[in-house]
Amino acid sequence: MFGRVLGRETVQYFEALRREVQARRGAKNRAAEAQNGGEDDAKTAFLNFAIPTPQRHQTVVPGVGTLHDCCETAQIFASVARRLLFRSLSKWQSGEARERLDPASVEAYVDPKVRQALKTISFVEYSDDEARSCRNAYYSIMNTFDALRSSDAFHQVASFVARFSRLVDTSFNGADLDGDGQQASKRARVDVPTYGKQRGTLELFQKMILMHATYFIAAVILGDHADRIGAFLKMVFNTPEFSDATIRHFRQRATVFLVPRRHGKTWFLVPLIALALATFKGIKIGYTAHIRKATEPVFDEIGARLRQWFGNSPVDHVKGENISFSFPDGSKSTIVFASSHNTNGIRGQDFNLLFVDEANFIRPEAVQTIIGFLNQTNCKIIFVSSTNTGKASTSFLYNLKGAADDLLNVVTYICDEHMERVKAHTNATACSCYILNKPVFITMDGAMRNTAELFLPDSFMQEIIGGGNVSGAHRDEPVFTKTAQDRFLLYRPSTVANQDIMSSDLYVYVDPAFTTNAMASGTGVAVVGRYRSNWVVFGMEHFFLSALTGSSAELIARCVAQCLAQVFAIHKRPFDSVRVAVEGNSSQDAAVAIATNIQLELNTLRRADVVPMPGAVLFYHCTPHGSSVAYPFFLLQKQKTGAFDHFIKAFNSGSVLASQELVSNTVRLQTDPVEYLLTQMKNLTEVVTGTSETRVFTGKRNGASDDMLVALVMAVYLSSLPPTSDAFSSLPAQ
């Protein structure tokens, strides 16, 4: 073990020294290399051309030179430049990577007429002194590419992709993995006829599994070069538009694939695991399934594939539970098999990839063992299972649907919008969205569905398709009735025309959020008033900070004050009081700062004397536990469930109305604030958890936020509380 670590550290130290020497050699030696580089685009010499751009706005594009940094954000330009660098691998590498790393594409990136015109342009050159910094930066970047391409880890990644491409070329029937023209015989397999079709194809979920495994292993074995391999993998997988966020998604340490029956889940894992074992040195793979009988065929097939492709000598079986593959340099890769009935086989192991087949059906205690590998930084868990929704115990992975980190990948032929329609039409097996995506190797038609239903009712939706109702599970049902939603949207009384008969008090609730992520939470603000037993919404805001600075509390307070100012401006008669509650759960100090700044903003507005100001501005005060001082914030604790119960009852009874003159400065002009609010309300669900059947309301579903809804619910709740003498009080004069 210590020898391996010492060897790895020695190689890293040698590469660091080589990069340092190359950087010192500068342009002179690199120019000489470029003359002998042939068609290797990475050996292109530095092209001296001047650009009228300050240095802080310059960027170095590998293979091109120093340009304006806007070129780095141009996806087409950046992808073409990197593609040309890695394309030379097919000319530079002989054997296994030849002509396989670059997918078929048109080579003409520039119109011929434009190309001819460019040849007539003479570029202004820097002087030797001016060009020195650009030249050094260029060769420094190119040296990193040289170090990447010359590393053994990169050769392994390139070889793995090239071998898998050849395997797909032969529809998984041949084994000419090294490009020598020799194909070993493979066992016969009854399959759909190809009708002369030579090259095979991958289903989208199969390609995604391949990409998840490749991206993660590349990041593990490349070390310092992991950030640069993304451009190469974008090219070989033909995904040039992938963003950095998408790349991070493929590198995350867990992912789940739920796929209908007979779609080639396990069948695809066999060549994937076998090629990974035979290509990546020192890799450790784990494979587990729900029963022992399910792991044995996979074990035998992987061993057979390895012996078929590489002979018997490098393949070694140990006790029927693991397979090791030996490389010429003495390194080994290993796969360990275990069933969920005996998870001790994977305890104490050190895996890089852990495949969990039919994961929905493994035992709960096995799940605990598997989840423990999430604590290992260089291990990725790939769950693969059927989309079973007949029982809650065999559908637990479906609970990941809608998670913020996008762990779940579901293969389905019915979208959520058309699910109910397909259930109602007994002959339908796919909706209009996905009907063209069905593979040719499955029989999914009305006759098949009817036959399945004859054996067992609902078996098609639960066992084959998935997405049906899970028996024994608490499904989230909409809490607001359709009638109440339509009434809230259509019937909007005028608070300006009817101000005389309405209450003269306004209630404001502020739910602050200190984040710049517009996909997460924002600040919700609601302004409500009373008309007898009804509540009327005067104003609503959904505010997001553009940056996290020391003035965040001031910006949130200004948003609240501007909303109130517009409410005051359109109503001629001044309100008697405005009662403000600022939630302090996330930060009590920030809540106090927001309340103070709201008071300052309203004081400024009062001195300006441009709108009718209320007689008093009061703030909700709370005394924290262990303190005798009341502070201007509201702590939301166990009141939330009761507040939502109260609001749902009032809303479904038609007692919550929106003003015809509803104010909103943050909702876009082309969007109706009431419709925007209804979108959040439709996501609200009631979830019952635990043996005590604890009820929890949540509106954060499918990536949507519920900030405006929470603010409205709490504003209605606070305006319904019995009046007390000490709950709301004014702040000291500023």
UniProtKB/Swiss-Prot annotation:
Motif Walker B motif in this chain: 353-358
Molecular function per GO: DNA binding; hydrolase activity
Motif segment (Walker A motif): 259-266
A Pfam match: DNA_pack_C
InterPro entries cross-referenced by the UniProt entry: DNA_pack_C, DNA_pack_C_sf, DNA_pack_N, HSV_TRM3, P-loop_NTPase
Nuclear localization signal (motif): residue ranges: 184-190
Gene Ontology CC terms, in alphabetical order: host cell nucleus
Subunit-structure text: Interacts with the terminase subunits TRM1 and TRM2. Interacts with portal protein.
Record-linked HAMAP family: HSV_TRM3
Protein name: Tripartite terminase subunit 3
Species this protein is from: Equine herpesvirus 1 (strain Ab4p) (EHV-1)
Species lineage: Viruses, Duplodnaviria, Heunggongvirae, Peploviricota, Herviviricetes
Gene: TRM3
